[in-house]
């Protein structure tokens, strides 16, 4: 069965890649990071050239509302699961105060998990792989049989730019359920070669922290995701750093539980319990323009005030029964 999956996977990857090749934008393959990254590009072109698959960062989280710090709506709290669902795995909003303990996912390998009282703000997904990332999270709602760990591994494969055609058979099968052939072909084209040992050390020579730490984690994940026998726990230790998180460059003091005012007119806040589970609270005031609009969790990245911590994309899958 695994061999059959591999043959079909390789076949449609090859066909779709040929069809889509002419549509690839040159600008998506070129370019580079500014500042110190440009200076290092000759040393580590594969690691640093071009945009990361997901670029969402703290400057994109522009909707925090400090005036609502300490505020709790008077409405009785209800489960988001009581609202009408959408084909995207989202929810049709109605006036009221809602909560859901959701499955959330790490989008920044080589950084620290939630903790230390740091707050999180709303920002939308941005970057070359935003479409694929949102598709995985949205489509996972219709596939409850897929384990959260496997969804996280697919997202790490995208972030680390692993070759999807080289993934373990089970992950390939999962990818085929959640992504289109065109999306898979695009991800395969943007993949990087796996490096380890002295080759990895040489490639990272001269790269400063924290860029080195992130690039090293991504390189290790690329190798592990395509190596039979690598366990989820081993990959998690690479992607999610333990210990106290120092303040990252450009960090802001954001208290835990700060509300963000979504552009659609509702308030949202995120309170993570580790990277894989987040308490999402939504308040839709009476008369809000958000009434009747969709809350699509896949369009929500919870961005920490401490840039050394992980960005967490939300999902419409409950972590536990609501």
What is the predicted role of each segment?
Residues 11-22:
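Bacterial N-terminal signal peptides
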Residues 2-13:
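Bacterial N-terminal signal peptides that target proteins for export
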Residues 97-228:
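Mature extracellular/secreted ectodomains of secretory-pathway proteins
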Residues 73-74, 81, 91-93, 99-101, ...:
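Long, low-hydrophobicity ectodomains and other hydrophilic envelope-associated domains
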Residues 28-29:
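Boundary of Sec targeting at the N-terminus
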Residues 32-36:
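Extended, helix-rich scaffolding/adaptor regions
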Residues 37-157, 254, 275, 284-313:
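Short, surface-exposed polybasic-aromatic patches that bind anionic ligands, especially phosphate groups
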């Amino acid at each position: 069965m695994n061999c059959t999956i591999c043959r079909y996977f390789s076949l449609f990857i090859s066909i779709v890649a040929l069809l889509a090749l002419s549509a690839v934008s040159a600008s998506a393959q070129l370019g580079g990071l500014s500042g110190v990254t440009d200076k290092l590009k000759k040393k580590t072109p594969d690691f640093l050239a071009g945009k990361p698959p997901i670029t969402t960062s703290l400057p994109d989280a522009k909707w925090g509302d400090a005036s609502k710090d300490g505020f709790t709506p008077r409405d009785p709290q209800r489960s988001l699961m009581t609202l009408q669902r959408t084909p995207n795995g989202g929810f049709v909003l109605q006036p009221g105060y809602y909560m859901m303990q959701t499955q959330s996912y790490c989008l920044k390998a080589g950084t620290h998990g939630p903790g230390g009282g740091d707050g999180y703000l709303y920002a939308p997904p941005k970057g070359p792989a935003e479409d694929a990332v949102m598709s995985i999270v949205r489509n996972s709602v219709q596939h409850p049989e897929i384990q959260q760990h496997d969804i996280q591994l697919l997202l790490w494969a995208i972030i680390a730019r692993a070759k999807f055609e080289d993934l373990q058979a089970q992950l390939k099968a999962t990818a085929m359920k959640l992504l289109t052939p065109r999306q898979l072909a695009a991800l395969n084209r943007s993949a990087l070669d796996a490096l380890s040992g002295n080759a990895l050390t040489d490639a990272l020579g001269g790269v400063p922290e924290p860029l080195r730490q992130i690039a090293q984690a991504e390189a290790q994940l690329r190798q592990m995701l395509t190596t039979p026998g690598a366990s989820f726990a081993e990959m998690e230790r690479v992607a999610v750093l333990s210990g106290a998180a120092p303040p990252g460059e450009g960090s802001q003091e954001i208290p835990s539980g700060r509300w963000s005012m979504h552009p659609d007119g509702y308030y949202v806040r995120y309170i993570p319990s580790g990277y894989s589970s987040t308490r999402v609270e939504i308040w839709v005031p009476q008369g809000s323009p958000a009434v009747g609009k969709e809350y699509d969790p896949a369009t929500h990245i919870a961005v920490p005030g401490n840039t050394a911590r992980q960005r967490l994309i939300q999902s419409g899958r409950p972590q536990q029964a609501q």
